[in-house]
Amino acid sequence: MTSERDGTSATFGLTRRVLARLSAGALAVTPTLIAERRDFHRYAESGWTEFRTASLIARRLVDLGFDVKVGRDVLDPDARMGVPDVDVLEAAWGRAKAQGGDPEFLKEARGGFTGVVATLSHGAGPTVGLRFDIDALDLQESHAPEHRPEAEGFASVNDGAAHACGHDAHAAIGLGVARVLADLSSTVKGTVKLIFQPAEEGVRGAKAMVAARVVDDVD
């Protein structure tokens, strides 16, 4: 619904110009979004072991100008549920390091602290939170030649971990949203929090982020 007088959409009070920029921005980031989704798919990591995934997300958000918090700053250690044994965590952390995880943020995530929260603020206004899951399932991905990820070279290389529930896309979409918001930061008033949640499978990760008061200020 749009006012012909001022060109303002009733949806979120956005002007036609801003909506057009949102649409153009979404189209512009699509190739990068696809590439990142396939990268996350190829290096699938299950709950509390998303070390590579979380570290690369954090690095890209910092590069986009977001205020980024990770690790124990966004996860209450005592509220985490279903955390793997220490030897499993350490093996996954070492694998993430070998597979190109960001060194700075890998340190913060070590031990199963794989949450990321990015904030972008510009002036007074509401605080909106958007959540994105990042974990894979404990499954073995098919390597049959007709399986599209296998045929196109992005099937999971990590045995026993596969993105069969779309969280590779969730994570990539979150970064796509971040890129569009960064471009529009001077236009939109208020605060946006992008919450990249680990261990969604088994409903294990949200409690620890809530306990860390990540969403206390979200309207």
What are these regions (language model features)?
Residues 12-163, 172, 183-188:
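Acidic/His- and Gly-rich active-site-bordering loop/insert found
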Residues 1-6:
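N-terminal acidic, proline/glycine-rich, low-complexity intrinsically disordered segments
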Residues 168-219:
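Acidic/histidine-rich catalytic neighborhood of metal-dependent amide-processing enzymes
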